[in-house]
Each structure stands twice: as structure tokens, then as C-alpha cells.
Amino acid sequence: MSDLKKAAQRAIELMDLTTLNDDDTAEKVIELCKKAVTPAGHTAAICIYPRFIPIARKTLIELDAEDIQIATVTNFPHGNDDIAIAVLETRAAVAYGADEVDVVFPYRALMEGDETVGFELVKACKEACGDDVLLKVIIESGELKDPALIRKASEISIDAGADFIKTSTGKVPVNATLEAAEIMLTVIAEKNRAVGFKPAGGVRDAAAAAEFLGTAARILGEDWVTPRTFRFGASSLLSSLLHTLELADAPKGAQGY
């Protein structure tokens, strides 16, 4: 198997296959669940809005694919600084049955100089998740822009108890970049804690996936790159990867994240 095909296979196993569109329906989520059961194996997770968790759980059971985790989003997509609302949304997501919660860090507050609200929000949301539900914190690196702010948001999130740090919501012009990945992965290495990394949005094909995988392996070691500590957040990437593996036709133009 070529290096590109190996990267494609790996990226599928590390993928949070995502639909977070305003026009999502139960039918679209059922289709997403079916797509997550790929000819190359199951994706690590699906990522959907909270209200669709019950139908997704039912569908994954019917597909005999209960190993696929269900991730959802809270404080999404704007990263507001209202801790109470973020916590209530996170509790509701856990009550719905989420295995993982991707919460948006209050990045605009950080840009305005407030480091406290981000820490308190992440800490409270992790408490709402408990030990059994992973908390991934979306720092929105493409809006923070400044490497110092990307580093600071990563440090605050990890110090507050994040299980993962994630680049992006996929709802802003700039999503995952290798520059942001380098900073975020370096912070994880410095913190020396079992914290994962999730590039999301903008990873379009196996070659791009390979670059992110290579960056993670260089900074944290080849053995570190597993579904417990590395995920790709993507919607259009899957069809490109299956094409690379010669398991599907070429995608008809990238749609979405």
C-alpha cells in the first residue's frame, strides 16, 4: 500500500464524520451514520447537533456499528462567554447520550484580554461531562490568528481539563492550518498530559491529511496518533479518501467542511 493510501486509511479510522448544517434532518443524519460504515472500516465518530443523537444512536445500533462514537457541539458556533448557557447545553448533550462534546471556547473574550472566562467555561463544561464523556474544546484558531493567542487558548483549555483541543468550528473563513496544528500540538507536548488534537475543516484530501498526521507524529510520536488522541473533523474528506483507496468514484467537488 502506498504512503498516500496508508494516510487515507488512517484518516478514515481517525475521522469524526460531520454534519452541522442548518438544514440537517433526521434523514440526513441516518445517511451520515450509513456513510460512517465505510468500505474501509468505521470512522471513529460522527459529529451532529444534539437533537439528532437519539436517532443516530438507534441507527448505529441497527447498523451493528456501536463502536462509532457520537460527538455533538455546544456553545456553537459563536463561542459566547455565557458560562451558564454553555454548561446547560453541555448537560443536555450528555443527557441525550453524547459520547463526546465539542464545545466552542469563548475566543472573542480572549481576544479582548479576558483569560478567566475561557478557563471557567471549559472547567465547568468538563465537570458537566464527567469522566465518561470526552470534552473537545474548539479554540477557533482561524479567528484568533495570532500565534500567541492560539497558544494561550490551547494552554487555558488544557489547564481547565479539556480532553482534546480542536482547531475550528468549520463556520469561519479560515479553519484547520498546519501552522495552528504546530502550535497546538507543541502545547500538548509541553503539558505532558493525555490530551488529543482535532484539526477540523479545510482538510480536503489524503495528501492534506498526511501532512497533519506527519506533524503530529513528529511532535508527539507515531504511537501517539490514535483515535483516543487524534481526530479529523470533516464532511467532504471521506469521499476523497475512499477515492484514493479506489473504493469510490472521484468526489463531485468538495462540499462543506
UniProtKB/Swiss-Prot annotation:
Reaction catalysed by this enzyme: 2-deoxy-D-ribose 5-phosphate = D-glyceraldehyde 3-phosphate + acetaldehyde
Active site per database record: D102 (proton donor/acceptor), K166 (schiff-base intermediate with acetaldehyde), K198 (proton donor/acceptor)
Keywords: Cytoplasm, Lyase, Schiff base
UniProt record similarity statement: Belongs to the DeoC/FbaB aldolase family. DeoC type 2 subfamily.
EC number: 4.1.2.4
Pathway: Carbohydrate degradation; 2-deoxy-D-ribose 1-phosphate degradation; D-glyceraldehyde 3-phosphate and acetaldehyde from 2-deoxy-alpha-D-ribose 1-phosphate: step 2/2
Subcellular location: Cytoplasm
Role, per record: Catalyzes a reversible aldol reaction between acetaldehyde and D-glyceraldehyde 3-phosphate to generate 2-deoxy-D-ribose 5-phosphate.
TM region positions: none
Enzyme class per UniProt: lyase
Top-rank taxon: Bacteria
MF term (GO), any: deoxyribose-phosphate aldolase activity
Protein name (database record): Deoxyribose-phosphate aldolase
PANTHER family linked: DEOXYRIBOSE-PHOSPHATE ALDOLASE (PTHR10889:SF3)
Pfam families: DeoC
GO BP: 2-deoxyribose 1-phosphate catabolic process; carbohydrate catabolic process; deoxyribonucleotide catabolic process
UniProt entry tagged with the keyword Cytoplasm: yes
Gene Ontology CC entries for this record: cytoplasm
Keyword NAD: no
